[in-house]
């Protein structure tokens, strides 16, 4: 007799799998993974935990509903019969109905082919993760999805304060010639102490603002969109999406699946199967986004400094690098020499950002505008900086990685300078994305990746190893790069 698995609907978050005990064991082992760094976690070290996160609960028989396609694959591979009693019916939207929707409201920004395919895929499947790189126009995809489901309530979750303001501004721009969509009347922003409750059908919020809210807040939403979902803390994202137990339409977007905070299985479980929308290489080839040239500048230090740094831990090495006078002088002279709008990204505000900003204020001609943006800059001020820079031709923006690597949409950036060491794959790709957006004054961009060679007796320093990881990123994304070695004075 064929082994059967009966799948029943629990909520919009979970399905139940009714099956024999031995199949439960197989499901338990199939739907598990080890998170990054599990071997360093105290519970694992004390042998209280095997290092695995299990997605199928053998007691409740529950598993994330977004994993239905994986459950089907599991069953087919083992020749088990999967009986789907969830009652979900997937009927693809007809060509006529989709065309009627696309022409039902005016918008100056027309969907590109890959964007239209992403919108249609999301409508057809009701839940999915859209894999689409930085600068591919995800906010326009989100806008069209919200328009499709209006007047049903939609929750758009973003990773940073800046993106709340930016998403709102994008919606305003998309609806500029549409009298039926007034962002002020229809869209509510939640960040930094803003009122949570609203009668407006569209809510944009950071995940941090939603994390502590009780389940009642989420009960009326029909659509949830998790923008840049790979950037959320796994526990926070899971809690929020579990609270949305009445929400049938669930769309996630992500630029990358490599080295992400939230594991691929959890992303798919909470939203749905992954759909690859386009790639950076395709966008550059089609001239949708700017081409980018990467100049890797390796700064060489004297033997005495290398010997000193070789005895340092990671944080001490970082402190040494960002406080090095000749290094900071070199960076600022480089920035001063660049033509066009230049984005200088730093990690530490007090120890590095303030120093770079002060030097630039001294050496840069007073006719050039210099902006300083970090986590303490409120969202409205950041938005004003964005608007001002769009009109400038030779401005300098000193910004912390945290603020500008995750989505502030300045198209008019000609140069990006990585002034601080960064090992985060996501942060680096997002930062590069700042330079990929085309504008009227730009169809190419340059990245200056500054790294530090403090090798001593064949021992590479921490941040030089991080540079090697960034080179792997550039190679995998097929970005052209050149490496230059510069000897620092001192």
Named regions from a protein language model:
Residues 124-146:
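Walker A/P-loop
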Residues 163-189, 363-364:
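Conserved helix-turn-beta segment of the N-terminal RecA-like "Helicase ATP-binding" lobe
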Residues 186-197, 354-355, 368-405:
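Conserved helicase ATPase core of P-loop NTP-dependent helicases/translocases
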Residues 309-347, 351-362:
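Conserved interdomain hinge at the start of the Helicase C-terminal
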